């Protein structure tokens, strides 16, 4: 009887614990499938958490550099409250108000719109197809700024590897600089979520050292910060589905927070997560409803086995009492067995 009672308790515990496990696994599979469909249809990595700011031309250098320090720190704090593991992150800064001077044509200066850009941890996520990486600090001994570019950028800019060019700002009050394209890069891994945004952003970009951009180019007044972007690639595949309500609440707060500060916040899958929070509640209710008949049957089973066990033990309890055992002694005699069950 004790063995039967133990089996009943074991079945009840198994049924109760199976519901959240099954629900979590089901929602996880559904979410990953929908995320993959989202990526195929939009071309964007589903877990991208993106905050950007476009800076007006009248913004002073000190304010630009302060923003470079403040925005990544603000985003780091906010994204930490979202209970999704972080896969990768980077900060991108650029000046898209520059022109690359390609030469002259019949006495007319030939120029192409170019974007001077820099990003954190860039060298860890690329391989060089040709040439070399820009020098430490980004400025050669002869004072020329060293940059690297993609094949697409070279074609777009009509530039060549090891070519040296003059770059002029749209703002005529800024001094021109000279840049040397010392390397041609490509992504080290096509599936690296560091490159989660579309490649269109780098079609006409020359990449330089991050500190060189923020300290030398901005500090020296040769460039201006026109845009800053902080990207976090969140590993949605590892998200605990039990955290879904808190995740959607945190993201909803982030939309309000960034909007009040004048930043642009993008989380393409926010609507999907909101829908899944509702679906999770519905699925939980359905699963528990389906479990009720089984749980009632197990409850009756435990009740009947317990009654039979009590009837069986009555004679033994009577014998113990006849031998002078107190109720307290009898209770402690059966307590270990009940505790184990």
Features from the language model and the residues they span:
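Membrane transport/envelope proteins' first extracytoplasmic loop
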Residues: 1-298
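Interfacial "coupling" helices/loops that link adjacent transmembrane helices in transporter permeases
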Residues: 26, 300-340
């Amino acid at each position: 009887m004790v063995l039967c009672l133990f089996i009943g308790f074991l079945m009840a515990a198994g049924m109760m614990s199976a519901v959240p496990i099954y629900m979590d696994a089901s929602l996880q599979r559904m979410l990953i499938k929908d995320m993959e469909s989202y990526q195929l249809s939009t071309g964007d990595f589903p877990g991208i958490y993106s905050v950007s700011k476009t800076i007006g031309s009248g913004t002073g250098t000190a304010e630009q550099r302060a923003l470079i320090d403040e925005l990544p720190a603000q985003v780091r704090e906010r994204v930490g409250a979202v209970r999704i593991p972080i896969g990768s992150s980077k900060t991108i800064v650029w000046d898209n108000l520059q022109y690359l001077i390609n030469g002259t044509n019949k006495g007319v200066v030939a120029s192409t719109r170019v974007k001077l850009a820099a990003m954190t941890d860039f060298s860890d996520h690329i391989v060089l197809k040709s040439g070399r990486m820009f020098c430490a600090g980004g400025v050669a001994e002869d004072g020329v700024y060293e940059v690297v570019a993609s094949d697409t950028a070279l074609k777009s800019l009509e530039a060549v590897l090891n070519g040296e060019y003059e770059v002029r700002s749209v703002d005529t009050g800024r001094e021109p600089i000279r840049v040397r394209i010392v390397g041609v890069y490509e992504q080290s891994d096509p599936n690296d979520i560091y490159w989660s945004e579309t490649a269109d952003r780098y079609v006409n970009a020359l990449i330089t050292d991050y500190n060189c951009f923020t300290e030398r180019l901005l500090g020296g007044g040769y460039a201006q910060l026109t845009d800053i972007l902080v990207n976090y690639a969140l590993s949605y595949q590892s998200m605990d589905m039990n955290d879904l309500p808190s995740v959607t609440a945190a993201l909803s707060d982030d939309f309000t927070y960034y909007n009040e500060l004048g930043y642009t916040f993008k989380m393409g899958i926010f609507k999907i997560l909101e829908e899944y929070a509702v679906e999770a509640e519905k699925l939980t209710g359905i699963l528990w409803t389906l479990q009720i008949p089984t749980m009632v049957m197990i409850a009756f089973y435990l009740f009947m086995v317990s009654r039979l066990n009590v009837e069986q033990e009555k004679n033994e309890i009577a014998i113990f009492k006849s031998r002078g055992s107190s109720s307290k002694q009898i209770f402690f005699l059966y307590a270990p067995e009940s505790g184990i069950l």
